[in-house]
């Protein structure tokens, strides 16, 4: 195939110009897409999604909390007796109850996370705590997977325990008419909890 050289000052027909333009387009490579444009094309077919993270405060540091049950903490009762105070052991391990109105966290409504006093597992967010007037800390919901519910042998109440170590927290009551999203009251012993403020004082 022969090609004519276009020179200035010469008049060409529309057919000749069209032919030359077609040949030029066939041999000129289009510019490569920039990296940012390639990324846009790659991900534009489906929306981006990111896994949601739950965060809590545990031992002065932020920890992620998923929806699955926490890792089990198994200790012999002799070891629990050695690391807990006598009153903590009586309530957490022997399912006792503190006197109403005497608990450290009954009237505390600061922002933060309530963890198990035995093993440190995050249990409740402060945003779920409310004043029920019952004399014990009250929450309308626990963190996902953190609380185990077990009916008492008499069937009249439902015990709540730490899902990680089995420490006794208290009982949960439903249908009492409190204006909460769940209509539940987790009645928890203060001594079963350890509160970590969201913004601890330096």
Swiss-Prot record:
The protein's Enzyme Commission number: 1.8.4.12
Role description: Catalyzes the reduction of methionine sulfoxide (MetSO) to methionine in proteins. Specifically reduces the MetSO R-enantiomer. Plays a protective role against oxidative stress by restoring activity to proteins that have been inactivated by methionine oxidation. May play an essential function in association with MSRB1 in maintaining vegetative growth during environmental constraints, through the preservation of photosynthetic antennae. MSRB1 and MSRB2 account for most of the leaf peptide MSR capacity.
Gene3D superfamilies: Peptide methionine sulfoxide reductase (2.170.150.20)
Cofactor(s), by name: Zn(2+)
Gene Ontology annotations of biological process type: protein repair; response to oxidative stress
PROSITE patterns named among the record's database cross-references: MSRB (PS51790)
Domain MsrB positions: 77-198
Transit peptide: 1-63
Localisation per UniProt entry: Plastid, Chloroplast
Cysteine pairs bridged by disulfides in the record: 134-187
Catalytic activity: L-methionyl-[protein] + [thioredoxin]-disulfide + H2O = L-methionyl-(R)-S-oxide-[protein] + [thioredoxin]-dithiol
Note: Reduced by thioredoxins f, m, x and y through a dithiol-disulfide exchange involving both redox-active Cys of the two partners.
Active site: 187
Chief site of localization: plastid
Binding note for cofactor: Binds 1 zinc ion per subunit.
Keywords: Chloroplast, Disulfide bond, Electron transport, Metal-binding, Oxidoreductase, Plastid, Redox-active center, Transit peptide, Transport, Zinc
Binding annotation for Zn(2+): 116, 119, 162, 165
Organism from which the protein derives: Arabidopsis thaliana (Mouse-ear cress)
GO CC list: chloroplast; chloroplast stroma; cytosol
Induction (free text): By photooxidative stress.
Protein name: Peptide methionine sulfoxide reductase B2, chloroplastic
GO-annotated molecular function: metal ion binding; peptide-methionine (R)-S-oxide reductase activity
């Amino acid at each position: 195939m022969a090609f004519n050289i276009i020179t200035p000052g010469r008049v060409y027909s529309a057919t000749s110009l069209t032919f030359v333009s077609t040949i030029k387009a066939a041999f000129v490579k289009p510019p490569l897409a920039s990296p940012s444009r390639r990324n846009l094309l790659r991900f534009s077919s489906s929306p981006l999604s990111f896994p949601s993270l739950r965060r809590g405060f545990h031992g002065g540091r932020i920890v992620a909390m998923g929806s699955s049950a926490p890792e089990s903490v198994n200790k012999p009762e002799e070891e629990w007796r050695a690391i807990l105070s006598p009153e903590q052991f009586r309530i957490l391990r022997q399912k006792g109850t503190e006197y109403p109105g005497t608990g450290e966290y009954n009237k505390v409504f600061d922002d933060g996370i309530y963890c198990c006093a035995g093993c440190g597992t995050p249990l409740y967010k402060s945003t779920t705590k409310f004043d029920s007037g019952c004399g014990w800390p009250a929450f309308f919901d626990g963190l996902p997977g953190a609380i185990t519910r077990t009916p008492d042998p008499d069937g009249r109440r439902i015990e709540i325990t730490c899902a990680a170590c089995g420490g006794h927290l208290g009982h949960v009551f439903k249908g009492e008419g409190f204006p909460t999203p769940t209509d539940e009251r987790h009645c928890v012993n203060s001594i079963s909890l350890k509160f970590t403020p969201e913004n601890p004082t330096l």
